[in-house]
UniProtKB/Swiss-Prot annotation:
<keyword id="KW-0472">Membrane</keyword>
<keyword id="KW-0597">Phosphoprotein</keyword>
<dbReference type="InterPro" id="IPR038497">
    <property type="entry name" value="ATPase_V1-cplx_hsu_C_sf"/>
</dbReference>
<keyword id="KW-0375">Hydrogen ion transport</keyword>
<keyword id="KW-0968">Cytoplasmic vesicle</keyword>
<comment type="function">
    <text>Subunit of the V1 complex of vacuolar(H+)-ATPase (V-ATPase), a multisubunit enzyme composed of a peripheral complex (V1) that hydrolyzes ATP and a membrane integral complex (V0) that translocates protons. V-ATPase is responsible for acidifying and maintaining the pH of intracellular compartments and in some cell types, is targeted to the plasma membrane, where it is responsible for acidifying the extracellular environment. Subunit H is essential for V-ATPase activity, but not for the assembly of the complex.</text>
</comment>
<dbReference type="GO" id="GO:0000221">
    <property type="term" value="C:vacuolar proton-transporting V-type ATPase, V1 domain"/>
</dbReference>
<dbReference type="GO" id="GO:0046961">
    <property type="term" value="F:proton-transporting ATPase activity, rotational mechanism"/>
</dbReference>
<comment type="subunit">
    <text>V-ATPase is a heteromultimeric enzyme made up of two complexes: the ATP-hydrolytic V1 complex and the proton translocation V0 complex. The V1 complex consists of three catalytic AB heterodimers that form a heterohexamer, three peripheral stalks each consisting of EG heterodimers, one central rotor including subunits D and F, and the regulatory subunits C and H. The proton translocation complex V0 consists of the proton transport subunit a, a ring of proteolipid subunits c9c'', rotary subunit d, subunits e and f, and the accessory subunits ATP6AP1/Ac45 and ATP6AP2/PRR. Interacts with AP2M1.</text>
</comment>
<dbReference type="Pfam" id="PF11698">
    <property type="entry name" value="V-ATPase_H_C"/>
</dbReference>
<feature type="modified residue" description="Phosphoserine">
    <location>
        <position position="483"/>
    </location>
</feature>
<dbReference type="GO" id="GO:1902600">
    <property type="term" value="P:proton transmembrane transport"/>
</dbReference>
<dbReference type="GO" id="GO:0045851">
    <property type="term" value="P:pH reduction"/>
</dbReference>
<dbReference type="GO" id="GO:0006897">
    <property type="term" value="P:endocytosis"/>
</dbReference>
<keyword id="KW-0813">Transport</keyword>
<protein>
    <recommendedName>
        <fullName>V-type proton ATPase subunit H</fullName>
    </recommendedName>
</protein>
<dbReference type="Pfam" id="PF03224">
    <property type="entry name" value="V-ATPase_H_N"/>
</dbReference>
Length: 483
């Protein structure tokens, strides 16, 4: 992977401001271990070890102690964490564990070795903490789980992984709801604090998706829809960056590139690129675009991504970006790569490719192909390919779109399809398209009404020559309507 990948690992492991500030506060409040010992809540062995551990100030001293007493360290941390109920003390232990792992990633092994002897998994001690009420405790536990899973010698699997990924999805979706104003903030957590906690969750996901096996598990858990939901909502640029970073990581896998075709990612990312004022957001979108074109093994997949980028006016954006100066040479390299690849795709672009790409983007406009008699004569039957894939998209747009232009163009295209494909009427009826077009005959927008009416006429009529004369007589009115 690239050097940017390494930077990403550092980014993801660094805590957000609120967690860093709270952790500093927690470290400063030393625990009176002696009182726990006197109350018989902890063993003398654990009390003695934790007090010695706290006295090791330098990383070298701590490392030496962990090399000789790693097993005791894991045992003590877990004993204290599970036997003490006071929130402040649990926070303190979790902070110690997180600091210990952050200083040296290889230290995750002490927890794996200890868990193995107890016939447990390293994360089994921390997963239950995700249900606690205190936000700092929950998010520290989440960070520790991600580090164990990403840096450890064993993979998290099965119900543990499902549980953790579902927790991440729930947290990210709650951010989506907050952003759209569906839920009100409750308790004492401010909106700003809450968004920082969500950034911490996104950081956990970034760490996890660096491991190829977890990418597949995340996609199977419907994680891509979760990411797209956050990106489609107005979220802060930091969370935006983290979500796109996650998409970029997914796209390192050729199989993932194949799978991600169905999510319509390119239009969402190109919209963000157009509005982006942060260099790091621009950089990660370009890197994701590059992965889609570079890591996809199938030529058809590469072409589909390239066409989607062309359809979403990415070429124009790249030309504008090329004029700017960047400190990061990765950006310039990615711009050059993308301009070259998209330029090649434009050369190979057939009118059917153009139409197919526009339709898949869901952003229909009155581009020349829609009005081209030659296009429909040559390509109407091709809308039946891949089990009517394009026709299904067309009818779906008639059902779900609220954009008058999209509805007008879609209705027009249904009409042209049935006019040029002999068995088209029956196909459209089977897909529910006839009823959908009829529903728009009373639409508030004049263009939608007009094109729906024409499409219905084409669905009903048997004498094309007669209809042709009728349409010619109506043309001056439509021209006036458009002006």
């Amino acid at each position: 992977m690239t050097k940017m990948d390494i930077r990403g690992a550092v980014d993801a492991a660094v805590p957000t401001n609120i967690i860093a500030a709270k952790a500093a506060e927690v470290r400063a409040n030393k625990v009176n271990w002696q009182s726990y010992l006197q109350g018989q809540m902890i063993s003398s062995e654990d009390c003695e070890f934790i007090q010695r551990f706290e006295m090791k100030r330098s990383p070298e001293e701590k490392q030496e102690m962990l090399q000789t007493e790693g097993s005791q360290c894991a045992k003590t941390f877990i004993n204290l964490m599970t036997h003490i109920s006071k929130e402040q003390t649990v926070q303190y232990i979790l902070t110690l564990v997180d600091d210990t792992l952050q200083e040296n990633h290889q230290r995750v092994s002490i927890f794996f070795d200890y868990a193995k002897r107890s016939k447990n998994t390293a994360w089994s001690y921390f997963l239950p903490m995700l249900n606690r009420q205190d936000l700092f405790t929950v998010h520290m536990a989440a960070r520790i789980i991600a580090k164990l899973a990403a840096w450890g010698k064993e993979l998290m699997e099965g119900s543990d992984l499902n549980y953790y990924f579902n927790w991440i999805k729930t947290q990210l979706s709650s951010q989506k709801l907050r952003g759209s104003g569906v839920t009100a903030e409750t308790g004492t957590v401010s909106s700003s604090d809450s968004s920082q906690y969500v950034q911490c969750v996104a950081g956990c996901l970034q760490l996890m998706l660096r491991v190829n096996e977890y990418r597949f598990a995340w996609v199977e858990a419907d994680g891509v829809n979760c990411i797209m939901g956050v990106l489609s909502n107005k979220c802060g640029f930091q969370l935006q960056y983290q979500m796109i970073f996650s998409v970029w990581l997914l796209a390192f896998s050729p199989q993932m590139c194949e799978h991600l075709r169905r999510y319509n990612i390119i239009p969402v990312l190109s919209d963000i690129l157009q509005e982006s004022v942060k260099e790091k957001v621009t950089r990660i979108i370009l890197a994701a675009f590059r992965n889609f074109l570079e890591k996809s093994v199938e030529r058809e997949t590469r072409q589909e991504y390239a066409l989607a980028m062309i359809q979403c006016k990415v070429l124009k954006q790249l030309e504008n970006l090329e004029q700017q100066k960047y400190d990061d040479e990765d950006i310039s390299e990615d711009i050059k790569f993308l301009l070259e690849k998209l330029g090649e795709s434009v050369q190979d672009l057939s009118s059917f490719d153009e139409y197919s790409s526009e339709l898949k983007s869901g952003r229909l406009e009155w581009s020349p192909v829609h009005k081209s008699e030659k296009f429909w004569r040559e390509n109407a039957a091709r809308l039946n390919e891949k089990n009517y894939e394009l026709l299904k998209i067309l009818t779906k747009l008639l059902e779900v779109s609220d954009d008058p232009q999209v509805l007008a163009v879609a209705a027009h295209d249904v009409g042209e399809y049935v006019r040029h494909y002999p068995r088209g009427k029956r196909v459209i009826e089977q897909l529910g398209g006839k009823q959908l077009v009829m529903n728009h005959m009373h639409h508030e927008d004049q263009q939608v009404r007009y094109n729906a009416l024409l499409a219905v006429q084409k669905l009903m009529v048997h004498n094309w020559e007669y209809l042709g004369k009728q349409l010619q007589s109506e043309q001056p009115q439509t021209a006036a309507a458009r002006s």
